[in-house]
Design a protein with these regions (language model features):
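Interdomain "pre-motor" coupling segment immediately N-terminal to P-loop NTPase/helicase cores
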Residues: 1-10
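Pyridoxal 5′-phosphate
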Residues: 14
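Conserved P-loop/Walker A NTP-binding site and adjacent catalytic elements of P-loop NTPases
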Residues: 18-142
Length: 142
């Protein structure tokens, strides 16, 4: 697979998403493992991506989320689950930047505060810990 083939311009995402990744994050092409994941993702398959730390798993997840929200299920919502509050905050900042460029609302659920409720309810993409997701599901099923 050549570098040209791995260009982000070959992704089936709206131009504004491609432009964001290129101009704001300096991403011009995907790494080989990221590129290999794109076929199944854009064909609506679930994948398990096991690659080293800092090799681009989050970008693959962001592209998968954007593909669903912008291409296949406009008006739907996504949940990005992480194990730690610190990681949730980090991903929130990244996704908030994407959301500002693409008109998506990003929510963060990591605490017990009722002030989070509106943020959670209004978000297109919710980033939360597994514990918070469990709490949300239990409290809303009652």
């Amino acid at each position: 697979m050549g570098e040209e083939e791995r260009s982000i311009h070959n992704l089936s995402l709206p131009k504004k998403a491609i432009d964001f990744f290129e101009s704001e994050w300096g991403i011009e092409r995907l790494h080989p493992p990221q590129f290999e994941a794109m076929g199944p993702l854009f064909d609506q398959h679930n994948i398990l991506l096991a690659i080293p730390t800092a090799s681009g798993k989050s970008l693959v997840a962001y592209i998968a989320i954007l593909n669903q929200l912008l291409n296949h299920n406009p008006g739907s919502r996504a949940v990005y689950i992480v194990p730690l509050k610190a990681l949730a905050s980090e991903k929130f900042e990244e996704l908030k930047e994407i959301g500002q460029h693409l008109g998506l609302k990003i929510g963060l659920g990591i605490g017990d505060a009722t002030s989070e409720a509106k943020n959670i309810d209004d978000s297109d993409i919710l980033i939360c810990t597994s514990e918070k997701l469990d709490s949300l599901m239990r409290s809303r099923s009652e």
